[in-house]
Amino acid sequence: MVHPVELPAWKELEALAATTGRRPMRDMFAEDPGRFDRFSARLGDLLLDYSKNRIDAQVMAALVRLAGQAGLPAAREAMFGGEAFNVTEHRAVLHTALRNRSDRPVPVDGHDVMPEIRAVLARMKDFAGRVRSGDWKGATGRPIRSVVNIGIGGSDLGPVMVTEALKPYQKADLAVHFISNVDGSHAAEVLKLCDAETTLFIVASKTFTTQETIANARTCRAWLVEKLGEAAIPAHFVALSTNGKAVAEFGIDTANMFGFWDWVGGRYSLWSAIGLSIALAVGFERFEELLAGGHAMDRHFQDTPLEANLPVILGLIGIWNANFLGADAYAVLPYDQYLHRLPAYLQQLDMESNGKGTARDGATVSWGTGPMVFGEPGTNGQHAFYQLIHQGTRLIPCDFLAAANSHNPLGEHHLMLLSNVLAQAEALMKGKTGAEARAELEKAGMDPAEIAFQLPHRVFPGNRPSNTLLYPRLDPFMLGQLIALYEHKVFVQGVIWNICSFDQWGVELGKVLAKAILAELSSEKTSSTHDCSTAGLINAVRQMRQ
């Protein structure tokens, strides 16, 4: 198996990084008035401007060659074709099938999975309709007014992000809450908002054994039983799981269990039954629009030439910035308060997928892989960490996202928001030269000695890369496109880095150690296998809890 650093295009890009990669983007824009048209791409109403990167036609051509040499087209077809692309768990990777809106069959081991997917969707539609209409009643005959999703990781981050993003579409008399953290304070604060008679709990755990989720589910079960009695459980609990035995033992009627499949990774599961909270919040028709948006991006990703393919372009630009220009992180900056949970969602999607140090063939990688991801909605982030992005010593490319139209057109608020996002992208690219800074200070009437002192602090180096994603309005279809865009971007990069993007063994070791420490915290014995720091902390916790 050929590693990326051995590919001809990789070596070509290393040479280009020493030339084009160091050129001021100011000069590139000055020399090419058509740069925006040349380095932007569209899918329907979604516009990607990637012109504010240190690229030219030669760099982009080399990046596309890199994708070809790394086997991206074949890998893409293998994933969509249901092959066991998750090599360490020997599983297909078919979250795309969950949003397949075509009549195409999707085979896994020779079996078309679409009939099963459609059957689950039909059950979700029926259930969501009954709850939203008031037909589904709690144990005392009152309709449901609060939904509490209990899950963690992919069973939480995706549904939380989507329900927050689609708040303008939510049913006014149905509140949707989420409990994820095993910290009891999370459950306690959510339960304060709920009336037991009108609350429906969704327990989201594929195996129904996830420690945090089951602990929270038991707490919520005890809360309900205390108020309404054991017989109330079937009317107030449903499960998203494949473990019917454990679900039944918990007291949930397995007729109210919605299943999914082992080829659905947690961080890709919002499209599955895990999205039930989304369907309850915004209605099943809106959930279908979300699926349709994801499917539209799937078709684009599968059918569009690499050089005009939005996920491929985003992925390749990320490779260029990370592996050739030295960026260890990138910032996701949605200028949309409804997308305030998008950075956290993309942290899991990107860092859990591509935070790997082992190649698909088992070799230790000698090249950079997944970057760190962080972000905040604009304009809040401008008053927090943008200082480092503008004038710090680390290169941090940015993805800006913005809708041209607001769901809440209050005065000039949205124009102010848009002016800020466009200004930030321009400022990062242009920077401010010493001459420009001097002219500003002189115009302000500053004396020469003070100017000499202040000048180095007022210069912005610029040449900071960014992408801008612009769309008319954030609706379910557009949100589906954006989520699938980033999913496929992560896939592209994982293929080029030659890593497995669909496992997450790194989360397992801590779980195992936590089980042992849990037992020790409630006893007086400390295992001799711990290092002195961990043993000391265990003893300190015991003393503080006495």
From Swiss-Prot:
The keyword Cytoplasm applies. InterPro entries: G6P_Isomerase, G6P_Isomerase_C, Phosphoglucose_isomerase_CS, SIS_dom_sf, SIS_PGI_1, SIS_PGI_2. Pfam families: PGI. GO terms for molecular function: carbohydrate derivative binding; glucose-6-phosphate isomerase activity; monosaccharide binding. Gene3D superfamilies: 1.10.1390.10, Glucose-6-phosphate isomerase like protein, domain 1. It is an enzyme of class 5 (isomerase). It is found in: Cytoplasm. PROSITE patterns: P_GLUCOSE_ISOMERASE_1 (PS00765), P_GLUCOSE_ISOMERASE_2 (PS00174), P_GLUCOSE_ISOMERASE_3 (PS51463). One of its GO terms (biological process) is glycolytic process. Pathway: Carbohydrate biosynthesis; gluconeogenesis; Carbohydrate degradation; glycolysis; D-glyceraldehyde 3-phosphate and glycerone phosphate from D-glucose: step 2/4. It catalyses: alpha-D-glucose 6-phosphate = beta-D-fructose 6-phosphate. It comes from the Bacteria. One of its GO terms (cellular component) is cytosol. Its EC number is 5.3.1.9. Catalyzes the reversible isomerization of glucose-6-phosphate to fructose-6-phosphate. PANTHER family: GLUCOSE-6-PHOSPHATE ISOMERASE. This is Glucose-6-phosphate isomerase.
